[in-house]
């Protein structure tokens, strides 16, 4: 084997290991892991010359598909439904207001044309799904706020992509008409929503009804369907990112075969893609170029975090049932991450004049946003009394892993208050002969099911069932 190939493989493995270890340090330091991944990439620029924006964009888009799929499949519709209106307003009007304000300031601070200034604003106007999901994942912040922020970050990428592509087209072709843009936006978002739902229900049918030779193939199938959703929707001129998130949300909130396997595989794969993506983004920038725009970058970061984002949030959430403190927290939690940097590669590839300055300025703003805002989310939530109770998650997960075809699966059933089986012994509960309770998780303990075992509120049951009886069995424990 070629020695260069071996070195490349070793380097990739070393970077992934370094990224995993870095995550442990980021939790202890209170710094978002993406900041450390970017620093790793920037530190390697002295040894590795890398300036391929096209490959970075391709990896970034692929990573965002996986991250959006992960976020959507783990989101609960019961949490999303009450905040759908506010999060949609944030993802559209909020992004637009933020983009215009930041773009106007960037025009004068960076000495850009109006179109270039608005392009900068469009690129940094949206929050980032990877950054928000990672920052909120282990924080004890109220569900209402985390759901709002996650829904916003999962749905505002299409707005930023649309504005970025439209402004690049306007810069390269000044004769482009602006009057058709609102209609184009509505059609693109509408098509993304409809195709996301269509692909979502189609994916459920495929995953639940296909009988594969190994359970390990189901997560691969699910991710393949997510990629097909993105590419198919994009080819039809719809919003591929919106379609992926809606598809994942649809799949995740319906009965799904091998759900836990799919979620665990997706979670691990998303982490790997995040590490790779942020290191590549760090490699793409040269530290000396950032130093040349230090004061401009700091001023724009300050304007975005302290002025533009809060104004966008407060204006787009007029009339909603959110307190001033909650709006303030949402304003501060608008983390930037991979999406703006990936979008900043669009003008580079399109050959827009001054695109290198735009890329470096975007990178500076994203880095400072992730570092400052990401590190202060929890203290701010505590200061504003918006921290919820610590969420205790059971360390135990049980699932049927089959080496071949099977018609059975293990489902997870959580006993909620009001369940008719709470307080009963297992021997007094009628279950079909082919249904078996294999384990009961109570807090951090695993209870062996016996006939005299009494079921309690919040118990998690792992039940072996025929796939065809999933709904019937779930109703027995309601």
Residue positions per predicted region:
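Residues that form generic nucleotide/phosphate-binding pockets
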Residues: 383, 429, 476
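Short, compositionally biased
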Residues: 453, 473-478
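Cytosolic Rossmann-like ligand/nucleotide-binding regulatory domains
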Residues: 416-468
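Transmembrane helical cores of multi-pass secondary ion antiporters/exchangers
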Residues: 1-392, 404-405, 456, 472
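Short secondary-structure transition/capping segments
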Residues: 85-86, 406-411, 437
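Extended boundary segments
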Residues: 28-29, 391-427
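Short aromatic/hydrophobic contact patches that present stacked aromatics
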Residues: 89, 412, 462
């Amino acid at each position: 084997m070629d020695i260069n190939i071996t070195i490349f493989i070793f380097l990739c493995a070393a970077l992934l290991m370094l990224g995993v270890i870095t995550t442990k340090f980021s939790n202890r330091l209170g710094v978002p892991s993406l900041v450390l991944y970017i620093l790793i990439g920037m530190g390697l620029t002295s040894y590795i010359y890398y300036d391929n924006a096209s490959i970075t964009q391709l990896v970034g888009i692929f990573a965002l598909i996986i991250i959006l799929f992960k976020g959507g499949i783990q989101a609960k519709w019961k949490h999303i439904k009450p905040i759908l209106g506010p999060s949609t307003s944030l993802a559209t009007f909020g992004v637009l207001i933020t983009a215009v304000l930041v773009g106007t300031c960037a025009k004068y601070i960076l000495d850009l044309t109006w179109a270039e200034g608005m392009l900068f604003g469009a690129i940094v106007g949206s929050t980032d799904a990877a950054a928000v999901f990672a920052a909120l994942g282990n924080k004890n912040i109220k569900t209402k706020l985390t759901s709002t922020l996650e829904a916003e970050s999962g749905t505002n990428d299409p707005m930023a992509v649309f504005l970025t592509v439209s402004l690049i087209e306007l810069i390269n072709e000044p004769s482009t008409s602006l009057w058709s843009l609102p209609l184009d936006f509505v059609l693109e978002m509408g098509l993304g929503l409809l195709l996301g739902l269509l692909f979502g229900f189609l994916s459920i049918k495929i995953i639940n009804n296909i009988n594969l030779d190994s359970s390990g193939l189901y997560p691969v199938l699910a991710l393949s369907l997510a990629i097909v959703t993105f590419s198919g929707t994009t080819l039809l001129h719809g919003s591929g990112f919106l379609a992926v998130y809606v598809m994942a949300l649809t799949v995740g909130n319906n009965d799904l075969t091998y759900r836990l396997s799919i979620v665990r595989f997706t979670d691990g794969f998303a982490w790997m893609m995040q590490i790779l993506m942020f290191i590549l983004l760090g490699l793409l920038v040269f530290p000396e170029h950032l130093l040349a725009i230090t004061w401009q970058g700091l001023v724009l970061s300050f304007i975005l975090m302290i002025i533009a984002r809060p104004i966008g949030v407060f204006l787009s959430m007029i009339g909603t049932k959110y307190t001033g403190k909650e709006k303030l927290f949402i304003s501060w939690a608008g983390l930037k991450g991979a999406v703006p940097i990936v979008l900043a590669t669009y003008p580079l590839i399109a050959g827009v004049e001054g695109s290198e300055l735009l890329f470096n300025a975007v990178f500076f703003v994203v880095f400072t946003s992730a570092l400052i805002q990401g590190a202060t989310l929890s203290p701010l939530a505590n200061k504003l009394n918006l921290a919820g109770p610590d969420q205790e998650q059971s360390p135990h997960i049980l699932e049927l892993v089959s080496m071949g075809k099977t018609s059975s699966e293990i489902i997870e059933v959580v006993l909620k208050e009001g369940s008719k089986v709470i307080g009963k012994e297992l021997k007094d509960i009628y279950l079909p002969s082919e249904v078996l309770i294999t384990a009961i998780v109570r807090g951090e303990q695993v209870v062996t099911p016996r006939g005299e075992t009494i079921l309690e509120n919040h118990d998690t049951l792992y039940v072996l069932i025929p796939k065809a009886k999933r709904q019937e069995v779930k109703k027995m424990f309601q």
